[in-house]
């Protein structure tokens, strides 16, 4: 399964939703909490071009946030990305 990385904050409801969808699908992910860590938040913003959380990557592909993750799931594209081998 492709590596999934998600930048989060502890109190973000969109982060909770995104993580719940991934967990429901049995996907292990690397969570990078950016609460109060300016360096990690700056890293996320530089990588994503966005400052909002969550920011999600599947492999090297930036998915975006929670809305984009759920949209990908509704279109039937999430499982294919998750099962891709690099």
Protein language model features and the residues they cover:
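Thiol/disulfide oxidoreductase modules built on the thioredoxin-like
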Residues: 46-52
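Non-catalytic, surface beta->alpha helical segment in thiol-disulfide oxidoreductase systems
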Residues: 58-85
């Amino acid at each position: 399964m492709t590596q999934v990385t998600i930048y989060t904050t502890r109190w973000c409801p969109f982060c909770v939703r995104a993580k719940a969808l991934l967990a429901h699908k049995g996907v292990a992910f690397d969570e990078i909490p950016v609460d109060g860590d300016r360096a990690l938040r700056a890293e996320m913003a530089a990588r994503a071009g966005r400052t909002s959380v969550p920011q999600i990557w599947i492999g090297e592909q930036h998915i975006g946030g929670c809305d984009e993750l759920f949209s990908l799931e509704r279109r039937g594209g999430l499982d294919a990305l998750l099962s891709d081998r690099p």
